[in-house]
């Protein structure tokens, strides 16, 4: 009898020891999970909820300490709670499948596309754009230039003579941007998008991108050409200056501004104010836009790699991704011809910018595109 009692005592001790070990292991796992979650999401509600549920001395908000203690009284309840909370944490950490869902249902008619050019490029650049992407978006595209051109006006009724100088100077560029801004404000469009005359715009992709944002919010989207904020000096008075640093989207790649943000820019951009603002920092038009938005209004640039300028190596844009880009460009890069590398409907000699080949890739039903083009 004494021997049986000894066996029972030994089994009880072993069982209690195993139970304690299991509790310690689970507690260690829960603490490790808390530390990991804290490293990645220090302020997450799930992490706070986990701490409250697993620490009897810190019950969750709205919870009953007595019930919490009673639930924690058994290993089964403790383990079930740990499993349930871990599942909640994993669900919070998982990316949302709807993150790219449209914020606003818009069409191309909601976008004001401003193309900045100069008269000497009407034939060499604007005729190419008129034959390609503008041909499908005439009503949405407004051409801002410095000289009258009846031939260009016949192709599209949206040619606006800015009365600005034809020089490629800081003042002339800012003069044209000021007119672009004022014309957009006069319109009923939701989005203002600026591009240059060496840009191809995929309007379908542009609309898709802008639909992810609300035009009433403060949205400034584009691509910087610098790898750091630009440093400038703001003239406060004749004898008083201060340094300013800000990001700006390069005009050569194109950028877009929501109407909500554009209206807030009015004190520094409308009428003659834009020219005055540009003179305060003595920088060109696209820099002045960035200064007003980032430095004055405190709105951050949303960077998008879907915009491209001739200041980057365009050979790095793969042909398989051309249809997903918002803007493309061409020109010279490091003293070499800089354009999209692609097999297309036309040879490089026939189509040095590759815009015609890109257009036939996106719109193969274009009348002048070859029927059997190899891509």
UniProtKB/Swiss-Prot annotation:
Localization of this protein: Golgi apparatus membrane
Domain of life, per lineage: Eukaryota
InterPro entries documented for this protein: Fringe, Fringe-like_glycosylTrfase
Record keyword Ribosomal protein present: no
Residues reported in the UniProt entry to bind Mn(2+): 198, 310
Tissue spec: Detected in the neural tube, the eye and the otic vesicle, expression coincides with the region that produces the medial, intermediate and lateral neurons.
Keywords noted in UniProt: Developmental protein, Disulfide bond, Glycoprotein, Glycosyltransferase, Golgi apparatus, Manganese, Membrane, Metal-binding, Signal-anchor, Transferase, Transmembrane, Transmembrane helix
Coiled coil region boundaries: none
Cofactor note: Manganese is the most effective. Can also use cobalt with lower efficiency. Has some activity with magnesium and calcium, but not zinc.
Gene3D superfamilies hit by this protein: 3.90.550.50
Amino acids binding substrate: 125, 197
PANTHER family linked: FRINGE-RELATED
Protein name listed in UniProt: Beta-1,3-N-acetylglucosaminyltransferase lunatic fringe
């Amino acid at each position: 009898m004494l021997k049986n009692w000894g066996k029972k005592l030994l089994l009880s001790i072993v069982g209690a020891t195993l139970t304690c070990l299991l509790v310690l292991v689970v507690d260690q796992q829960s603490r490790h999970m808390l530390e990991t979650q804290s490293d990645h999401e220090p302020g997450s509600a799930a992490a706070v909820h986990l701490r409250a549920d697993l620490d009897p001395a810190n019950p969750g908000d709205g919870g009953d300490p007595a019930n919490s203690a009673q639930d924690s009284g058994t290993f089964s309840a403790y383990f079930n709670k740990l499993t349930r909370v871990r599942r909640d944490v994993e669900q919070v950490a998982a990316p949302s499948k709807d993150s790219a869902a449209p914020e606003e249902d818009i069409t191309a008619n909601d976008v004001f596309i401003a193309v900045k050019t100069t008269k000497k490029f009407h034939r060499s650049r604007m005729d190419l754009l008129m034959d390609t992407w503008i041909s499908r978006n005439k009503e949405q595209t407004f051409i801002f230039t410095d000289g009258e051109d009846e031939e260009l006006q016949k192709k599209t009724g949206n040619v606006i003579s800015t009365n600005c100088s034809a020089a490629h100077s800081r003042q002339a560029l800012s003069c044209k941007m000021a007119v672009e801004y004022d014309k957009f404000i006069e319109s009923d469009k939701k989005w203002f998008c600026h591009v240059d005359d060496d840009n191809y715009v995929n309007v379908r992709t542009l609309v898709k991108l802008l639909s992810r944002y609300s035009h009433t919010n403060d949205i400034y989207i584009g691509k910087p050409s610098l790898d750091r904020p630009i440093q400038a000096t703001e003239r406060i008075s004749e004898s008083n200056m201060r340094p300013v640093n800000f990001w700006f989207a390069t005009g050569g790649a194109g950028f877009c501004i929501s109407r909500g943000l554009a209206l807030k820019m009015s004190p520094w951009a409308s009428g003659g104010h834009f020219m005055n603002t540009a003179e305060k920092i003595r920088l060109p038009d696209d820099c002045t836009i960035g200064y007003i938005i980032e430095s004055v209004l405190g709105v951050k640039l949303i960077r998008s790699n879907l915009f491209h300028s001739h200041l980057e190596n365009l050979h790095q844009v793969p042909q398989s991704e051309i249809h997903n880009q918002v803007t493309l460009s061409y020109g010279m890069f490091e003293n070499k011809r800089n354009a999209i590398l692609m097999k297309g409907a036309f040879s490089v000699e026939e189509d040095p910018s590759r815009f015609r080949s890109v257009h036939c890739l996106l719109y193969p039903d274009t009348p002048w595109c070859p029927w059997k083009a190899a891509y």
